Amino acid sequence: MPHDQKALVLDFGGVVTRTLFETHALTEMALGLAAGTLTWRGPFDPPSDPLWQAMQRDEITERDYWRIRTREVADLTGRPFTEMADFVKAARGADPDAVMRPEALAAIDAARHASCKLAILSNELDLFYGSEFREQLAFLKDFDVIVDATYTRILKPDPRAYQHCLDKLGLPAANCVFVDDQLRNIRGAEAAGLRSVHFDVLTPRQSYDDALRLLGLPLLTQGDMT
C-alpha cells in the first residue's frame, strides 16, 4: 500500500445522516403525531433539553439518551418501540436517502474519487438504525471498512475502537482524518493519534470542508451537493 494512502473515517448518526432533532417534522408525519409534538432539540437548543445536557456532562450515555427518547415516543404513539432501531425504522424507513446529509455524500464522493479509503466508525449503527435501514444505503458499498460497536461491543472513546478501525484499514493513525459530532469521541481519536474534526451539526458544510482540507482535497462547492 502506498505510504501516502489516506482515509476518511466517519461517525454515522448526525455526521452522515441528519440528526433526529433536525427531522422532527418528518418523524411526526410518519408516526401520525401533530406538528410540534416533539420538542427536544439536543444541540440545536441545549437549554431546553435537560436530558441532552445530562449526556454532555457524562451523567448518562448517548445510548441512555436515545433509549429514553424512544420510550417517550412509544408512549406518545402507542407503538411498541422497544429498541431505538424500531423507532428509527418507523420514522425514517420509508425513505432513508431523505435523511442523508448532502454534504456528507459530496465529501464521501470527493474522497473516493481521490482514492482515499473510506471507513465508518460507529457506536451504534445497527443498534440505532437497524440492518435493514443500512442495507438500503447504496453509498455504503463504497466503504472499505465499517466498524460498528453494535457487534464489537467496544465503544468510542475506548482507544481499542480506533485501533480496531486502523487495523482494518491497514493505515497509521496519522494518515486518517476522523469526523465525529461528540467531543468525547474526538478527544479519544486525538489521543489515538488521528487528525480529527469535531463535527458541528449547525454548520455541516464547514465541518466537511475542514475534513477535506486535512486530506489535502478541494473544498465542497454548491454544485457538489445537488
What are these regions (language model features)?
Residues 1-10, 121, 125-226:
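Asp-based, Mg2+/Mn2+-dependent phosphohydrolase catalytic module
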Residues 31-44, 74-90, 217-225:
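Short, surface-exposed acidic
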Residues 22-26, 50, 64, 68, ...:
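Alpha-helical elements of Rossmann-like donor-binding domains used by nucleotide-donor carbohydrate transfer enzymes
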Residues 1-47, 191, 203-206:
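Active-site neighborhood of HAD-like aspartate-dependent phosphohydrolases
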Residues 4, 78-119, 159:
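Short, acidic loop-to-helix structural element flanking the phosphoryl-transfer center
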Residues 24-27, 65-70, 88-92, 128-132:
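Hydrophobic alpha-helical core bundles mediating ligand binding, dimerization, or RNAP-core interactions
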Residues 50-54, 128-130:
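A short acidic, helix-capping loop that chelates divalent metal ions and anchors anionic groups
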Residues 52-88:
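A metal-dependent, Asp-based hydrolase signature
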